[in-house]
Amino acid sequence: ITDVNKILAVCEESDRLESAQAFINNAAKELEQGALVFFAGDLNEPSYLDWQADTKDLFDHRGCIVNWGTSKLLVQRGYKDAYRVIHPDPVKCPGFTFPADNKSVIPENLSWAPEADERERIDFVYYYPNKNLQIKSAQIVGPTGSIVRGQRIEEQTKDPIIPPVNNQWPSDHKGVLITFYIKE
């Protein structure tokens, strides 16, 4: 699919935007009290920061520039994408978290679309800026490889990746490790 309106329409049907807005509304009360607020998880949706002009012809984006709704909403409401704060260039550091090359699983069981390059960064940590919070680092945790067109490949990126011990990994996703300094 290369029709951006269709892509976004399917995305809106998922209720992710409603869930993100509910989180934002609830977190506003915490922010008023000076709390540190984080939003993290597998969103099953890429970031709009990774689908702009510089990546439109990479990773099977097929010329599309997509302002994915959930990430756009969070950023518009003041939240920071922690990985992109440290690694702002999605070409050099795409930060792919799916599909991870879990060596104990055959590639076709790790992929939704084995004929495509479906690598995406769909696991995130967002935070709301606070004078008592400083981001220190952002890393990917998991296999150094991914699945592309049904095949295992080793990533050739500048992403800092912490590989699993003994090359064992329990998931088809990689993790995101963000380190913050918190002032008291």
What residue ranges belong to the model's regions?
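His/acidic metal-ligating clusters that form di-metal
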Residues: C11-L43
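A structural motif
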Residues: I1-D3, A40-E45
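Metal-dependent phosphoester-hydrolase catalytic domains
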Residues: A28-F38, E45-E184
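A solvent-exposed, charged loop/short amphipathic helix patch at secondary-structure junctions
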Residues: I1-E13, D54-R62
